[in-house]
Each structure stands twice: as C-alpha cells, then as structure tokens.
Amino acid sequence: MYIRVLEKLTDTALSAHLISIYRDYLPTQGTSLPKVVYIDCKNSFPIRTFHAHLATAPSALSVTSEQIMENVRVVVCLDLTELRKAIQTLSHSLAVERASSKETDPSSTSTTFVILCGLDAMYRATHLVDHLLAHQQLNDSLLRLRILAAEQESGALQTDILLPRAEFPRAASTLLYKEASNSTHPIKKPRSSWYGSGNMLGDYIIKFYTD
C-alpha cells in the first residue's frame, strides 16, 4: 500500500505508531534501518513522547534510540508549495542513496516512511492565495509520492496521511459500517458512494490516490 489516510493521532498514539513501524521493519540481512520523514505544517514532532516510548520499547527492537532518532527527519511545510519542494528533495535524496548503495552493496534495500500531518492546513493556506494552484500542487505532490513508491529501485516507500476525521466523512462512515457489521448491534448502513459534489480533502485523496 503506497498511500494511506489515517485519522489524526495524539502524540502518544503517533509515537506508538512510529514504534510499530520499527518493530515491523527491523533491519535484516540486506536491509537498512527504516527511515521516517515526518512532514507537518508546524514543528510538532512529539520528540519527548517518542523518546519515552523508545525507553520502554521491547528489547526486540535490538537498536538504540539514538540509531532510530538518527533516521527520523522532521520537515516543516507551511503550504503546498513548500510540500512540493520537500517531496522533490526527498526524491533527490532517494536517488543519491540508491546510487551510493549500488556502489557499496548492490543487493541492499531500504524502506522509507513518510508521515504527512497538517495537509489540510497546507491546502487551505494555498487555496486562499490561488484555488487552482492548490488543486494542482496537491495532485502533483500526491502523484509524485505514488511514483516514488512504485519505483522498485527506490526501495519501499509508504506514506501515511494523518487528517482529522471530519476531512474524510464518507470513508469514515463506511469504515464505521464495516466495523459495526461485525458487531452484535450493527448501526444503520451509511451511504458509501464516493460520487457527488463537495468532496472533502481526505475523501478526495482516498478516492484517487490510495490503493
């Protein structure tokens, strides 16, 4: 799965999510420690909470917290123009890393996780200036992330977009229905159609860019 839309997480939940990434993608023979690129519209990375979680993480992680922190990069983007530049920089970094690894260890593979927060704020900031530009840059950025993920030589790349549930009401209601259908007290089935005017940001991304 290249791109996922998830409900915005608290600092504690986000830290646990990052820990789970490292737990599930520990370096094995021929792989390197996963890299995390945390992008937000403000410098909100929960470093203290993350450090606290690392201190209590299972020994199965088998790497030090310093090693993990060295592989976490925090990027602040105030609008979609800055996000587009950040993704271009990421693309360049992956290309350089790919060329370097081919020289040192051609069989090695890498995994990069992009955690994208505050996309709704970036979109609004750009939309206030130029609504056409906002739509164009949103599509350019998301398409570029999918292309990078599809390039086998770039290694594995996955993007988690964290948004308030209000930004994907149709997807959220469908998910709630699926969960309720497995319970003893199912709720009334909501509309699950993706069509119609007035798509919210998250529903738009889910419709066109997620797998």
From Swiss-Prot:
Q: What is its main location?
A: cytoplasm
Cellular compartment(s) = Cytoplasm; Nucleus
Query: Key word DNA repair present in the record?
Result: yes
Which Gene3D superfamilies does the protein's record reference?
A: P-loop containing nucleotide triphosphate hydrolases
The source's superkingdom equals: Eukaryota
Its GO CC terms are: cytoplasm; nucleus; Shu complex
Q: What does this protein do?
A: Involved in chromosome segregation during meiosis. Promotes efficient recombinational repair and functions in the protection of the genome from spontaneous and induced DNA damage like mutations and gross chromosomal rearrangements (GCRs).
Hey, which family's this protein in?
Belongs to the CSM2 family.
Instruction: State the protein's name.
Output: Chromosome segregation in meiosis protein 2
The gene designation is CSM2
